[in-house]
Swiss-Prot record:
GO terms for cellular component: DNA-directed RNA polymerase complex. InterPro entries: DNA-dir_RpoC_beta_prime (IPR045867), DNA-dir_RpoC_beta_prime_bact (IPR012754), RNA_pol_asu (IPR000722), RNA_pol_N (IPR006592), RNA_pol_Rpb1_1 (IPR007080), RNA_pol_Rpb1_3 (IPR007066), RNA_pol_Rpb1_3_sf (IPR042102), RNA_pol_Rpb1_4 (IPR007083). Zn(2+) 2 binds at C813, C887, C894, C897. The keyword Transferase applies. The RNAP catalytic core consists of 2 alpha, 1 beta, 1 beta' and 1 omega subunit. When a sigma factor is associated with the core the holoenzyme is formed, which can initiate transcription. Its EC number is 2.7.7.6. One of its GO terms (molecular function) is DNA-directed RNA polymerase activity. SMART domains: RPOLA_N. Belongs to the RNA polymerase beta' chain family. Its cofactor is Mg(2+); Zn(2+). This is DNA-directed RNA polymerase subunit beta'. Binds 1 Mg(2+) ion per subunit.
Length: 1385
């Protein structure tokens, strides 16, 4: 270290230290003194007259080094020639002043003090080791009680805590010398020194083996963990008590003189000053042999001063400065957003950057951006100076500077040259995914705004209403190469989130291409036949045919396919003109249709697959130009008459009003409850809104015209509003409905829907009341957006943190395990086809055609678009794929299990940081997810209230594990929960399958035939019925008015209903028994009623099987938490237990009800072999299974959401992953956001990395300990090799926050959350951070081990083979001539 300082000022800078890992541990007092450059004895800082540091003070030059470079404090030695000399007068070494940033001092304490992190960071480590509660420990340390350090021969225990009275009593009783005790940190230190860790560890392991109580075992395990940590790390427990304190280098806690003789100082100086003052006072008191009380008080104050220095506010009130705000302690310097980690180490401000407003640059090519000259001049300054010197315009930097300031013409020429092919990076905040920073080649422009290419707006989420963007300049050659190859906008055509193009024409461009490719009946030149596309163009340019005329053209579909014969194609003139922008590889059929936004996206996708990246970029740019041009020529505009209000609107509204009145009457008569009435009213209005919208859209989208034969035909309309929405350029059906239909139902800020809808639309105008209702929802939306952004950002941060070390580390892990992927269906409808789910994955085994048995896909082959088509054509329902979840790589993930890199369209490269990409892909759409999924107009709630099932196909009806009862009307009533109805065609192939709910009425008997569109089943969506399976006479049991049942009077209707209420008496179980109606009168059925059930029968009534005896109103059955949007995603990733989660069965078997115990229902599941299992279900919860039902493992026994931890325990990792992926996807699908499954799988993999040890066997693991899966496997492998008993463990699901905090790397965890806790634990364990993840490397200032920085590439060096000039020339001549476009690209 020495020569580093004294080395010449002009030497080349030394290489930075090379290190491969970093360790953290507790410093011993010797270590602290050894590292220190001297003791700070005085609290003084600077002499305020001379501004020189005081000797032995906090800024002492003798200890910390000189304040001026190469100059001692008294000025005897100045300048370089004396370097390394120590001045004999003031004792200051003559060296550069920067050592004041790195030299530590120390303070010797007069009495030991405890380190607050090890005391108060829960669980208290000192308390754990000594087995003292934190409260008692604090009493000892703050001099309120005594601790026994050596019990001697007395019956007192080691470490026992006694109050002062008891201590004096004990001294009287046993004699003063019989035992030793004390108070304060000194006593605690003696106790810690007396610990024999090895013996203690053995003793604790024995205790664990012997103890029977779970709580005791857990307590002992916690203590053992701390003991083992100290044993293995080589830290000594007494080091947690400090004898001397290190003092931070003065430049890191500066004191800056302000004008007016005042000083601005860092809070740390105040805190150090307090410590030194109290320490010196204590030394003096000890020398004077002051009374014990005074000394004790002073020691306590010293302890408090040191506590405040390390972590102010952790104990007691925070010490405040003169301005009443708490002082910032050492811990606060590290913590939180503005702490060292997040402010300075993870994110830094950079030079060579600028920012400005953006404007659109429609004439730019995709790889360009417009950079204002002013900005370019400033950014490229050093380059310009260099070039000016090279050219000989100037000789010195100073004159170059002058020249640039005067903006001489030569400067602009040089600037043009410097800028050429030097990419710049543009960034728009917030950067939510990697496409938020992209590289462009700058084009110099006048003005002060940056020009941005319109096609990259989607990726940046930018618009031109005043957004700003930042420009950054890559300097080194390496960074320029990376910028060009990896970040250029032309290399980021596909989105990493779903693999579809993200560079897609939008708005005007879409409208232009849409208008071009529409056909109009009766246009000029209709039905003409042309010999070639060129002829069409000539005719159009001469005005002989209209753009939208339908014509026949003789042409080849794909110009690239020479074997094809020309054919007559039906098309329009506009499509032929659009064909001119296509590359030769893309067939004409790709655009021979009306091109809306979706079709354009598909076109770019097809082009990327067929013609490659370069052609796609050219196509995108040409589409942009064509789109803008023809949108301009079309001159589409909208006026108020374009909003056509449907004629039947009033009739629909009147009918709805009548229906609502009808419902109101039913409610007044007491037939339905208030909740049901509300639900039905909302439903009626939602339906009516839909009807009006349907009629209006029908009117808008069609128009009747007369064709050339004089016949009337209906064609898609040319209404401007319709065209905008239909093409996907702007607006949606929802918005048009509000313009010309009716606004519909509105929501209150609480998310409830107001039951009076707004029947007017914007064209008619709103009344004051209607306007007021609207403002409600609108303001809520604005407030939500503001809050949402922060939440979304936080979710992304947690996701990145948990997944940052998921990197592609090997090509193939060789696993034999995978996931079975099938189409995603909901209610018999296929939501996502199997093809979309397997595209870009790698097959696990060979995939065979089920009929011909030929191999479609070989094992370990990537499934591309062609193979997907093969698999779909073969009609495969399920295929086994490799997945990230089953990847066996120890660190990171293998390329085969990950599959395709979605943004590049081929198998993922080594070193790709797939974890971060996954986190960004999930977090980026987060801002779009609404806080609560209330869709104005209740379209969301319509989906839930499905009341019947219609068959989609013709065929025979089959019941699949359905248990039914035929009721009095002769219908089959469903009595089981997870039954399904299937429709099979004549060959016996199943065409569709639906789940049917309990209590549904089946309209068609088993094996009966059904036509398409016929109703299969219907049910009441607003109540959950309780049905009887048998007929007989009703008897009530424990249904006592005022105890378990209340007759509730409805204020409005005056009618009463019998409702089951909660009772204080736990023995009472309200139930309805069905007695045999015959002579015997025995009980043949018994039904327990949950709280809130409404009784539908009277006592002694005779009923039939399938009748409803009670119903539970829907409000209470909505227990499945309807947390929508972001909170739901966060809840899933945090693996929280839902509020009322359902108890699930762990085994297959038959259900019986056992005796109730403690007011809980007992459900017994009896398997065919083995022991029955019992489950207790809290009373008042509705049990969804019935006596005698057969349940499978993992099925819920009651209402409620699933608990992911239960799924993992019962059904295993794959089922859990499937559940999490499907649930997260459901939230995003509601918002129309596409995310590939594999991103969610990557995160789930990170959540499942750890296992919990159940049995330790003969390994070194601890019971209940959470360890990484591979650590557990390695330990077991060792045990097997030595013939010992292995440990057993269960998989563990950690939420993303927990998982981030428990990563191997303590640096990464500390920079995430709970910094002090993480560092405390790491120091005790003497943890070594091997710097494997991204975050810890960024913090240490190294290249990240991903992308171009992975270890395999890090040590590559380029070297140029020597070649003569002639060889070089011949090689150049041999190179093929590049055409102009290739050179441009």
């Amino acid at each position: 270290m020495e020569d580093y300082f004294t080395g010449s000022f002009f030497d080349k800078p030394k290489d930075p230290l090379h290190f491969s890992a970093i360790r953290i541990s507790i410093s011993s007092p010797e270590k602290i003194r050894e590292r220190s450059f001297g003791e700070v004895k005085k609290p003084e800082t600077i002499n305020y007259r001379t501004f020189k540091p005081e000797r032995d003070g906090l800024f002492c030059a003798k200890i910390f080094g000189p304040t001026k470079d190469y100059e001692c404090n008294c000025g005897k030695y100045k300048r370089m020639k004396h370097r390394g000399i120590i001045c004999e007068k003031c004792g200051v070494e003559v060296i550069p002043s920067k050592v004041r940033r790195e030299r530590l001092g120390h303070i010797d304490l007069a009495t030991p003090v405890a380190h607050i992190w090890f005391l108060k960071s829960l669980p208290s480590r000192i308390g754990n080791l000594l087995d003292i509660t934190l409260k008692d420990l604090e009493r000892v340390l703050y001099f309120e009680a005594f601790a026994i350090t050596d019990p001697g021969t007395t019956p007192l225990k080691f470490c026992e805590v006694l109050s002062e009275d008891k201590f004096l009593k004990a001294q009287e009783e046993y004699g003063i010398d019989a035992f030793e005790g004390g108070m304060g940190a000194e006593a605690v230190r003696k106790c810690l020194q007396a610990l024999e860790l090895d013996e203690l560890a053995v003793q604790l392991r024995m205790e664990m083996m012997e103890s029977t109580s779970e709580a005791k075992r857990k307590k002992v395990a916690k203590r053992l963990k701390v003991v083992e940590a100290f044993k293995q790390s080589g830290n000594k427990p007494e080091w947690m008590i400090l004898e001397c304190i290190p003092v931070l280098p003065p430049e890191l806690r500066p004191l800056v003189p302000l004008d007016g003789g005042r000083f601005a100082t860092s809070d740390l100086n105040d805190l150090y000053r307090r410590v030194i003052n109290r320490n010196n006072r204590l030394k003096r008191l000890c020398e004077l042999q002051a009374p014990e009380v005074i000394i004790r008080n002073e020691k306590r104050m010293l302890q408090e001063a040191v506590d405040a220095l390390f972590d102010n506010g952790r104990r007691g009130r925070a010490i405040a400065g003169p301005n009443k705000r708490p002082l910032k302690s050492l811990s606060d310097m590290l913590k939180g957003k503005s702490g060292r980690f997040r402010q300075n180490l993870l994110g830094k401000r950079v030079d060579y950057s600028g920012r400005s407003v953006i404007v659109v640059g429609p004439e730019l090519k995709l790889h360009q951006c417009g950079l204002p000259k002013k900005m370019a001049l400033e950014l490229f300054k050093p380059f310009i100076y260099n070039k000016l010197e090279e050219r000989g315009y100037v000789t010195t930097i100073k004159s170059a500077k002058k020249m640039v300031e005067k903006e001489r013409p030569e400067v602009w020429d040089v600037l043009e040259e410097v800028i050429r092919e030097h990419p710049v990076m543009l960034n728009r905040a917030p950067t939510l995914h990697r496409l938020g920073i992209q590289a462009f080649e700058p084009v110099l422009i006048e003005g002060k705004a940056i020009q941005l290419h319109p096609l990259v707006c989607t990726a940046f989420n930018a618009d031109f209403d005043g957004d700003q963007m930042a420009v950054h300049l890559p300097l080194s050659i390496e960074s320029q190469v990376e910028t060009r190859v990896l970040m250029m906008s032309t290399n980021n055509i596909l989105s990493p989130a779903h693999g579809k193009p993200i560079i897609v024409p939008s708005q005007d461009m879409v409208l232009g291409t849409y208008y071009m490719t529409r056909e109009r009946i009766g246009a000029k030149g209709e039905r003409t036949t042309f010999a070639s596309p060129e002829e069409v163009r000539i005719a159009f340019d001469h005005g002989e045919v209209d753009m939208q005329a339908r014509v026949k053209v003789r042409m080849i579909d794909a110009p690239d396919n020479p074997d094809e014969k020309p054919q007559l194609v039906d098309t329009t003139v506009g499509r032929i003109i659009l064909r001119e922008v296509l590359p030769p590889q893309v067939p004409f059929s790709a655009i021979n249709k009306v091109m809306n936004k979706k079709e354009l996206s598909n076109l770019i996708d097809t082009c990327y697959r067929l013609a490659g990246n370069k052609e796609t970029v050219i196509l995108a740019d040409r589409l942009k130009e064509t789109g803008f041009r023809y949108a301009n020529l079309a001159g589409i505009s909208i006026c108020i008459d374009d909003m056509v209000i449907p004629e039947g609107k009033q009739a629909i509204i009147d009918r709805a009003n009548e229906e609502v009145q009808e419902i109101q009457n039913q409610y007044t008569e007491g037939l339905i409850t208030d909740g049901e009435r509300y639900n039905k009213v909302i439903d009626i209005w939602a339906k009516s809104t839909e009807e009006i919208a349907k009629e209006m859209l029908g009117n808008l989208s069609k128009e009747i015209v007369v064709d050339s034969d004089g016949k009337e035909v209906e064609i898609p309309s040319f209404n401007a509003i319709h065209m905008m929405a239909d093409s996907g350029a702007r607006g949606s059906a929802q918005q048009i409905r509000q313009l010309a239909g009716m606004r519909g139902l509105m929501a209150k800020p609480s998310g409830e829907i107001i039951e009076t809808p707004i029947t007017a639309n914007f064209r008619e105008g709103l009344t004051v009341l209607q306007y007021f209702i609207s403002t409600h929802g609108a303001r809520k939306g604005l407030a939500d957006t503001a809050l949402k952004t922060a939440n979304s950002g936080y979710l992304t941060r947690r996701l990145v943190d948990v997944a940052q070390d998921a990197i592609i580390t090997e090509d193939d892990c060789g696993t034999l395990d995978g996931l079975t992927v099938s189409s995603l269906t909901e209610g018999g409808e296929v939501i996502e086809h199997i093809g979309d789910r397997i595209l870009g994955r790698v097959a696990l085994d060979d995939i065979h055609d089920p009929i011909t048995d030929e191999i479609l896909v070989e094992a370990n082959q990537e499934i591309d678009e062609n193979l997907v088509k093969k698999i779909e054509d073969a009609g495969l329902e399920k295929v086994k794929m490799r997945s990230v979840l089953t990847c066996q790589s120890k660190r990171g993930i293998c390329a085969k299990c990950y599959g395709r890199d979605l943004a590049r369209g081929h198998i993922v490269n080594m070193g790709e940081a797939v974890g971060v990409i996954a986190a960004q892909s999930i977090g980026e759409p987060g801002t779009q997810l609404t806080m609560r999924t209330f869709h104005i107009g209740g379209t969301a709630s319509r989906a839930a209230e499905q009341t019947s099932l219609e068959a989609r196909y013709e065929g025979l009806v089959k019941y699949i594990n359905l248990h039914t009862v035929v009721n009095a009307e002769g219908f089959h009533i469903v009595m089981s929960r997870n039954g399904e109805v299937a429709v099979v065609d004549e060959t016996g192939r199943e065409r569709e399958r639906y789940g049917v709910v309990y209590g549904a009425k089946l309209k068609i008997a088993p094996e009966g035939s059904v036509k398409a569109g016929e109703t299969l089943a219907e049910w009441d969506p607003y109540t959950m019925p309780i049905l009887t399976e048998v007929g007989g006479r009703v008897k009530f049991g424990d249904i006592i008015e005022g105890v378990t049942m209340e007759e509730k009077l409805d204020d409005v209707t005056g009618l009463s209903r019998k409702e089951i209420v909660e009772t204080k008496d736990s023995d009472k179980r309200p139930r309805i028994a069905i007695k045999d109606a015959g002579e015997s009168g025995g009980t043949i059925g018994r039904y327990y009623l949950p709280v809130g059930a409404i009784i539908n029968v009277t006592e002694d009534a005779v009923i039939c099987g399938g009748d409803i005896i009670a119903k539970i109103p829907r409000e209470t059955t909505k227990t499945k938490d309807i947390t929508g949007g972001l909170p739901r995603v966060a809840e899933l990733f945090e693996a929280r237990k839902p509020k009322d989660f359902a108890v699930i069965t762990e085994i297959d078997g038959k259900v019986n009800f056992g005796k109730d115990s403690k007011g809980k229902r007992k459900v017994v599941v009896t398997p065919e072999l083995g022991e029955p299992k019992e489950y207790l279900i809290p009373k008042g919860k509705h049990i969804s299974v019935h006596e005698g039902d057969y349940v499978r493992a993992g099925e819920p026994l009651m209402d409620g959401s699933s608990n992911p931890h239960d799924i993992l325990r019962v059904l295993g990792v794959k089922e859990l992953a499937k559940y999490l992926v499907d649930e997260v996807q459901e939230v995003y699908r509601l918002q129309g956001v596409k995310i590939n499954d594999k991103h969610i799988e990557v995160i789930v993999r990170q959540m499942l990395r750890r296992v919990r040890i159940k049995e330790v066997g003969d390994t070194n693991l601890l019971i209940d300990d959470q360890v990484e899966r591979y650590v557990f496997e390695e330990e077991n492998a060792k045990a097997f090799a030595e013939g010992k008993r292995p440990a057993t463990a269960e998989p563990l699901l950690l939420g993303i926050t927990k998982a981030s905090l428990s990563t191997e790397s303590f640096i990464s965890a500390a920079s995430f959350q709970e910094t002090t806790k993480v560092l405390t634990q790491a120091a005790i364990e003497g943890k070594v951070d091997a710097l494997r993840g991204l975050k810890e490397n960024v913090i240490m200032g190294r290249l990240i081990p991903a992308g171009t920085g992975i270890p395999r590439y890090r040590h590559l060096r380029l070297h140029v083979e020597e070649q003569t000039g002639e060889q070089a020339v011949t090689q150049l001549d041999a190179a093929p001539d590049l055409d102009a476009e290739q050179q441009a690209a």
